[in-house]
Amino acid sequence: MSTRENIAGNIITVLDAVTSPIELKKITREPFDVDELTQQQYPAVFIQSGNEIRSDETMTSTTITRQAQADFILVGFVKGTDTNIDTKRNQLISTIESSLEADRTRGGYAKKTEIVEVSTDEGTLYPVGGIRVVVRVTYVYTAGTP
């Protein structure tokens, strides 16, 4: 399995283990139709591999070592009322951030992990609240095995 795939798997594993302050009920790498979620499936998150920037670190006659900065896009949904939807979105963002920051090496596969962007639906999906978190992971790999 590639390093990038191992990192994606680590993100799923870490988020799947979260039980506090909120427990994520549905975590997947495949997009889903939020209208088809049951009440019991909230909060729900899907993770997608995003853009990646690569650069050569070292080159020998037989090997090229590259550094990559890969973005992983986490799209999450909560369900609430008109008095708590913003709080639920913020709880989901905070839960994702604190969980991923506990091990910034992604189980030893990465040099560092950063949350580089957070955005919300700003109430347009009510009574569902949506968030988008961009996680940037820097890692090193041997060319041909990203």
Regions found by a protein language model. Give the residues of each.
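Charged, amphipathic alpha-helical segments and their flanking helix caps
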Residues: 1-42, 46-146
